[in-house]
Amino acid sequence: MALHIGTSGWSYPTWKPGFYPDKLPAKRFLEYYSTQLNSVELNLTFRRFANASSQQNWIAATTPGFKFAAKIHQMITHFRRLKDCETPLRNFLQSLDLLREAGKLGPILIQTPPNLKADLALIADFVGLLPTAYQFAFEFRHDSWFTDAVFDVLKKKNAALCWAESEKMEAPHVSTADFLYYRFRQPEYSKAQLKKLTEEFMAQKEVFAFFKHEDTPEGAQNAVTIARAAGIEAKPFEMPAKKGKK
């Protein structure tokens, strides 16, 4: 079982002191994060490509085996709405080459707009463009997509149906790939719910799971609870030395 667990993003000062140490400078957030959790979901790639300098810094800051999932650019999902995407898809994937070459690129999350309804020909054509060397997960935000015909298209490409849940919608738990991709958006999760999720994850071959809470540290804390219960231990981290001390 391979569990890659974390949150959507990490650059949140409001996570102090519940997750980040109070005196930790923001430039070391990712370094500390990677000692507690082993994966993160990049949301910034939805609006802009990750440049080489950023990727080099992320690679250097994270522990061995750490994985970055990346949300695909809005040009593909929201502007072109999955149509005529061969060139922008190729450009997006190439923009992540440094992470991939370092062995730190996780799945690409393809999050469709809420007003994009199911179109079997559209999804079949788009999925046909996806190179098999990558992992892809689809988060559909209109329930018309949740049909066997769509699931079959994903299965043929080993693309995962994202099991996303929020107060507005919950995707059906249908497995379409050899890995699972979860996104948790509920405001609260009880200890019993986290225990159940841990058991569910442990029964799978490979899982990517991300909690979302930008304003408070609960999402990161929930991810840590599951990580520790699943046997993912915290790694050593050295806090910055106080000024005037060596």
Where would I find each of the regions flagged by the language model?
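Residues lining hydrophobic/aromatic ligand-binding pockets adjacent to catalytic sites
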Residues: M1-K246
